[in-house]
Amino acid sequence: MNAPYQVDKITAAQFSDWQQQAQQIPLSLPTLNPYIPSDFSLIPSDGKHYDHPVALTNGDSMRIYWMPSQFYASEPKAAITLALRNKSAISDARQQVLFGLNDYLSSLALDELNSQASVGGISFSTGEDDGLVFNASGFTQRLPELLKKLVEGYASFQPDAQQLEQAKSWYLDRLEAAEKGKAFEQAIQPMQMLSQLPYTQREARRQLVKQITLQEVMDYRDALIQHATPEMMVVGNLSADRVRQLGEELKQQLHSTGHGYWHSNYVVVDKPIKANLQKTGSSTDSALATLYVPLGYSEYQSMANSTMLSQIVQPWFYNQLRTEEQLGYAVFAYQMPIGRQWGIGFLLQSNSKAPAYLLQRFQAFYPQAEQRLRSMKAEDFAQYQQALINDLKQRPQTLDEEANRYSRDFNRQNFAFDTREKAIAQIQQLTPASLADFFHQAVLAQQGMAMISQIGGSHDGTHDADYAPLPGFTTWDEVARLQQSLSVKSDAP
């Protein structure tokens, strides 16, 4: 091509101008992610077999429990739980609101750290269990430093007024969402809430949100950490010495004043209670939930019986009320504890029948279920029994799942970590007759707590006739008041 063109010389002035502009352009390499691992070495085996985490500390020092992984020792990973136990964390409605706002604000502040950790193969979370709980798991080389950075970030973030308003909006949205769930979710909520000590009504918390100030959130955050009693559990590829060192570093970092051994409280069913709760739902569907917790059974006996019952009775309940009677499309039999006593429950959501009719059908099903339990062949029962035991003995699928097996015991200060073993031992002792006796005492004789939760459909306004009449039952307008009528215990000596 013969297109015309021209070449001009670059003058010294142009060079000088470009050089000056270049000096004003900030150029640098990206900051290195400090949590990307480079060392994947494994801790040497000490030749011991660990059935559960063991104590690394004694006396009034920070309680630390540790064990190497029994299933994933070839993975350079660990799972750490740091619990800052604090009786004042959520002891009233205001503190519960403060915890929720604080947790949301911390998630904003820790977002960059979360992103860095994720790229480095580490995940972490914060939550509440008798205080603030940090969980971190992943590759072990950077894990202790990440946990310390997480604690530091939580203890030092400084939100602004706009972020507080954002947190308040989020919290109110959560409260509203809980009240607009599906009918069966609303029906079972009172059973779930009853063990949350102390439970406070959502309306009470909603009224408090506007009053909360930024300084109050910061003061609460500081007290949450400073007045706590720290405890830690580690499972995986960290040596006992490194875990002790980490515990000492965290103690110095936290400056927590709590000391001595922590013991949580829990509600207790120690007398016959018949409780009813009822309200209009947020949809046109109705729902009914029942829960029966018998007296006279230990925690592990009730756990074994209720778990076994839910496995056996669920298909019977579903087939009768869903398949044959076509009463609804969310149909469940379930086990659930009130405090540390387990019971058996039934739940159904219907788009055509009111709670009063649903309870009639529940009550027609109960004696049929008892009769089927009593007439069950020994070999059929043994199959259910062995399947449940095999499930409890199944190998964990991940290191996190292995660690989670000990979390419930850790959170309730059962440092023998033997809930699973005790449950299996009780399941092995069950017979068709003993299981039927548990069912009879709980559901038919109602020798313990019988709890009914009725949700009326909102299609044309719920009428009193839609709710089941329950002679002998007390109808409670608030779960909080029902909870306050129960006894409270602690395992503290």
Predicted regions and their residues:
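Glycine-centered hinge/linker elements that transmit conformational signals in sensory
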Residues: 246-260
